[in-house]
Amino acid sequence: HIHRYSIVTAGVRLSKAEIDVIAKAFKKIKDEVGIASCGSLGLLDFDDFVKLKESGMARYHCNIETSPNYFKSICTTHSMEDKDATIKAAKKAGLQICSGCIIGMGESVEDRVDIALHLRDLKVDSTPINILNPIAGTPLEHQSPLTQEEIERTIAVFRHILPKVVLRLAGGRLKIQSFY
């Protein structure tokens, strides 16, 4: 049976009117269904998070995507500082934090260690680890797929640096031979 429901939006930032609509949806889910709610709603501020928490949202998802040093190579619409501010505001509002990354986007081994260290410093509760699946016609189409050893070493490093965090093998997990 279903334990949790998540509302996910596209784009960088929602308007206050959109936040109000989503808050009403979370309240209805809490009052009528009684399951936990999560949100992945882009870059929000503390007041937005307080409203959403009061309406029933328990966990916020905001991936950092990659290391602070490599972030500008991947994202042009906002900064790592924007992500950090969002995560810290959600945490301050009392929400659980789910934040992770995509590995295999051209980052170095050192970048992967920095991702885990950064997530540790942000005190996240769960971390999805996604593995890039290069797709033709996209900016990362020519990235070489990670080897099994690179994937497994990365997961091991994350487990070592984040011993109490729930690691979620997410997008691309079927690339992990030991997964199935």
Regions found by a protein language model. Name each.
Residues Q96-G104, R112, N133-Q143:
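Short, flexible active-site loops
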Residues L44-E54, M105-R120, L174-Y180:
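Catalytic cores of alpha/beta
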Residues A25-I29, A90, F158, L162:
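Hydrophobic positions in alpha-helices of CheY-like receiver
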Residues H1-I87, Q96-I103, D125-N130:
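Core AdoMet radical
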Residues I7, C62, A90, L119, ...:
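Conserved, mostly hydrophobic/aromatic
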Residues A17, V21, C75-D82, E107-D114, ...:
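Alpha-helix N-cap and loop-to-helix initiation/capping positions
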Residues R120-Y180:
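Auxiliary Fe-S-binding modules of radical SAM enzymes
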